Amino acid sequence: MAKDPGRVLIFDTTLRDGEQSPGASLNLEEKLAIAQQLARLGVDVIEAGFPFASAGDFAAVQRIAQQVGGENGPIICGLARASQRDIKACAEAVSPAPRRRIHTFIATSDIHLEHKLRKSRADVLGIVPEMVSYARSLMDDIEFSCEDAGRSDPEFLYEVIEAAIAAGATTINIPDTVGYTTPSEFGDLIAGINRYVPNIGEAVLSVHGHNDLGLAVANFLEAVKNGARQLECTINGIGERAGNASLEELVMALHVRRRYFNPFFGRDQDSPTPLSAVRTEELTKTSRLVSNLTGMVVQPNKAIVGANAFAHESGIHQDGVLKNRLTYEIIDAKTVGLSDNRISLGKLSGRSAVRARLEELGYDLTREDLDEAFARFKDLADRKREITDRDLEAIVSEQVQQPEARYQLQLVQVSCGTRLKPTATVALSEENGPDQTVSAVGTGPVDAVCRALNQLAGVPNELIEFSVKSVTEGIDAMGEVTIRLRRDGSLYSGHAADTDVVVAAAMAFINALNRLVAAQEHQPLHPQRDAVVLDARPTL
């Protein structure tokens, strides 16, 4: 059997695989804010990014290693393809962290070998030990992944894993890269690795899975029963295509059904010892932070963290819950960080009260950012009687989200009505240049604003999504706007909130436009799609 740490290790890849969700690109400050909250959540490993992809990715991983990694904190990990250039960059990026890891990988399925790598099985068996050995020469904690293991020949997989462990890999990760397997198949795959890889006892066995068939969490739980002890997952299940296995669902499944899973860890069925180190009361806070910063809305019926996860509409259910919550609820909402207590701030609240509440919500702002957030808070408090946590999150997430600002919005004015053509006048400045003003007509006020902004910026794009939702209840609620722009097949999200939804739309559009421009100037590599040319004897 694989090495057993006595519990499940939670490997969070929100900042790497999760960020590959279309439109979910994050800037450095956003990544740092999420990493700090992941540390508070208690994850064991943070995969902070793919350092070789771009200078921005390298800087983000290095900054997280410096500020989040610690002697008692999470392991900071970076991803690297099986090439010395990637591995060296990864080692340099994570080096500031006392607890650090290189995660290197290569595909093992025949379809990937033939069509992506154009390599033979023999080539891969030559590359793996050399690259793992090189990584091990740089640090002691090395994870090796067999990309597309779910569609790989098990016999070949056993050979590759044995070679990787012999070369120094301390964690072996088995990805279901395209979400193809069923729970019984995935469980059998993990059981086979435990049974037929002779040196598997020298490494922790990990799993990584996508949700293309909606089976990622079920696959992982079956893998746990068969000896997997590290789960690679993301907050809210975000990720490419249908997403990754959801961290909050996995953690709570193990928490709620601990008596069922305990025997698979060699424990007494009634053992009260948690199966993971995650602080479950931080789950809702973490989910909201990731949703706010990525602009990816959590579906209302999402398990554990959805808005309706603890809501009851049926009269029979409501009656039962009022008499005893256990009649229809298997989880106490407080366990995941939900509380009936609402702490509301108002126009008389001071800077220290706002700072303290933001820290409780997971935001650690610099003095300058706090000054700006407090100014926005006071402005909102003049227009809105009661400021709730969701209002604060909307204010600060928009601020943290600001990318490198090529364009800055200076003015928005609109006129519209039943007998008027919707017309917008906007003023825009470009990198400290003079303001430029233009007016445009549209089918509605938001369309007019976007047309005017496009005229001024002159950056080709296609607006493919506009959504607005109320942050809180009441007629004075802030409107939270998400805009997604597309260019050359890539999506760029903008997110803003204001009591005036037209102003919020303009701010969100500029936010997305700045992301688009920044991305076009610094195109990162994709760890799976951008396959390096691998020789049997790669060199720097």
Swiss-Prot record:
Residues 8-273 form the Pyruvate carboxyltransferase domain. SMART domains: LeuA_dimer (SM00917). InterPro entries: 2-IPM_HCS-like, 2-isopropylmalate_synth_dimer, AIPM/Hcit_synth_CS, Aldolase_TIM, LeuA/HCS_post-cat, LeuA_allosteric_dom_sf, LeuA_bact_synth, PYR_CT. Residues 408-540 are annotated as: Regulatory domain. Pathway: Amino-acid biosynthesis; L-leucine biosynthesis; L-leucine from 3-methyl-2-oxobutanoate: step 1/4. One of its GO terms (cellular component) is cytoplasm. It catalyses: 3-methyl-2-oxobutanoate + acetyl-CoA + H2O = (2S)-2-isopropylmalate + CoA + H(+). GO terms for biological process: L-leucine biosynthetic process. Its EC number is 2.3.3.13. Pfam families: HCS_D2 (PF22617), HMGL-like (PF00682), LeuA_dimer (PF08502). It is an enzyme of class 2 (transferase). One of its GO terms (molecular function) is manganese ion binding. It is found in: Cytoplasm. Keywords: Amino-acid biosynthesis, Branched-chain amino acid biosynthesis, Cytoplasm, Leucine biosynthesis, Manganese, Metal-binding, Transferase. Its cofactor is Mn(2+). Mn(2+) binds at residues 17, 208, 210, 244. Homodimer. Belongs to the alpha-IPM synthase/homocitrate synthase family. LeuA type 1 subfamily. Catalyzes the condensation of the acetyl group of acetyl-CoA with 3-methyl-2-oxobutanoate (2-ketoisovalerate) to form 3-carboxy-3-hydroxy-4-methylpentanoate (2-isopropylmalate). This is 2-isopropylmalate synthase. The lineage of its organism: Bacteria, Bacillati, Cyanobacteriota, Cyanophyceae, Synechococcales.
